[in-house]
């Protein structure tokens, strides 16, 4: 199993995923950064893409058959600007697509579902199986 052979490479990504699904009383930009860092780490370690926009577009296209992601309309520009702003505290006027508050929370929610799909596929689940798992789940982290 690939996931077992790569357990050290997947460990930090798995840890970020686990951290992202733990209940927290308040959402913050750190929660967004944890998810986007895990997605970037996944792509850097297991995919060929090196540019965040390309990473996102590739993953969104790859998992477009997943029901829970079909209507998410993840905006790559919002993800990139938000990541750059919250990681480097750049001037917000230079990152006009930066999200905050409820919008950032919703974006993080969508990205977490994408990350879950990446991990499930990595450990060997096909798209039909991922669809079945997510559609049958009543976990509130997958319901939007």
Give residue ranges: language-model regions.
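Amphipathic, oligomerization/interface secondary-structure segments
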Residues: 1-144
């Amino acid at each position: 199993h690939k996931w077992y052979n790569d357990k050290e490479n997947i460990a930090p990504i798995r840890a970020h995923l686990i951290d992202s699904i733990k209940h927290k009383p308040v959402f913050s930009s750190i929660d967004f950064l944890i998810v986007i860092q895990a997605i970037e780490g996944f792509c850097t370690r297991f995919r060929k893409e090196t540019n965040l926009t390309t990473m996102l577009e590739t993953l969104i296209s790859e998992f477009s058959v997943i029901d829970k992601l079909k209507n998410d309309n993840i905006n790559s520009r919002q993800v990139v600007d938000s990541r750059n702003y919250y990681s480097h505290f750049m001037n917000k006027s230079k990152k006009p697509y930066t999200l905050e508050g409820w919008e950032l929370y919703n974006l993080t929610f969508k990205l977490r579902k994408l990350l879950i799909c990446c991990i499930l596929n990595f450990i060997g689940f096909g798209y039909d199986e991922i669809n079945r798992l997510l559609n049958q789940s009543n976990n509130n982290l997958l319901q939007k």
